[in-house]
Amino acid sequence: IGMPGDTIQFRNGNLFLNNNPIPKIKIKKKYKIRCGTSTPVVNAYQETLPNGKRYIAVYNKIGTMQNTDLYKVPSNHFFFLGDNRDCSKDSRYLSSVGYVSSENLVGNAKIIFFSNDSISGSVLKFWNWNQSLRIERSFNLLK
């Protein structure tokens, strides 16, 4: 979400890019998302970046990232943000993930090859895939 020189911040659960709020529209579909030891049903939103790119993000309002410091992306680095806004280990965790160096980018994602709902079953337990495989997400080309 963040390019070199960009600033990113969450204020009261709202995402700001370069001090501008990212518009989000609530969608009808709800998701059951694991966050720590709880699995709440959460609201989903369509967010739109300044370049017009749209994507779905979920907010469960139980994570610790409702309000963050201001992140300024260094040169030759990028800022990655998970779609589970309140419970993703992403660039906001500077000591463990942090900003991603451009030398660590090795290609472009083209397809979601495999998607598993870990709430319904472990990806390692292939005998449960009939319950946990998210076929509607698997094998989709990325835009």
Annotate the PLM regions:
Residues 1-143:
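Soluble "head" domains of membrane/secretory-pathway proteins
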